[in-house]
Amino acid sequence: MRVGFMTYDSKINFYNIKGALTQPQMMTVGDVNDMFVPMAEGLMCTVEESEAVIDSLMEQIPQMFGDTRETETILGPVIQAGKEAFKAAGCAGKLIVFHHNLPVAEAPGKLKNRDDRKVLGTEKEKTVLTPQNKTYNEFGQECVGVGCSVDLFLFNNAYIDVATLSQVRPLQFCSHITCDFMMYFISSGLSTKWWPNVQVHLLSTRLRRRTILSRSSSQSQSSCGF
């Protein structure tokens, strides 16, 4: 099984993790309105082939992005990037996205903040409990077209519009957690998981357990994964 990694805020970073490298190489795509994969080789590799490079990348990501002050993030182009990666690799697989806030940056999949406490308990409440549009449903359908499924983990501590984002399905929901970067994992899951008031120091253990269980499911036995 091959794996790959991406990180993002308002841009998307792709990583060359070819085993022959001493360090992972990062390439950034800033124009996310016309998504493409910037590298032909090294984006997806087996863990056995690239274990040392992957370990190095996992150590570097918190150092590279721990102090980021980016306030607007994307999500739609990330899903499109994963789709394009699987398409370029000519393999089916699974895209695992860890996301933590409402995608409000100018890009495909941008959403409005509909958080309005005044409508709770009124007739208008149902308007914020239904999807804003069908964009994320369309993203999911495009992925299915190339044999790519999407697992979306949400780590939010503010309004994130689950009604709209959940159209990508399946969804894992972890509330009140701040997550500053996204990574590509092999996982699966067919139900919504909500972890309210999770303590950050316990998150890694619980999330690791969840992804291991998901990976062992029959749906994760594909040849590629982000």
Question: What feature does the model see in each segment?
Answer:
Residues 2-4, 11, 21-26, 58, ...:
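Beta-strand-rich binding-surface signature
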Residues 60-69, 108, 120-127, 148-154, ...:
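Short interface patches used for recognition in eukaryotic signaling and trafficking proteins
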Residues 130-226:
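Acidic, polar loop-rich interaction surfaces within structured domains
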Residues 18-27, 104, 109-122, 166-172, ...:
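Short secondary-structure boundary/capping segments
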Residues 1, 6, 20-22, 59, ...:
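Eukaryotic complex-assembly/interaction regions
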Residues 1-99, 127-135, 161, ...:
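Von Willebrand factor
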Residues 81-84, 92-94, 101-163, 186:
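VWA/integrin I-like adhesion module and closely mimicked acidic/polar interface patches used
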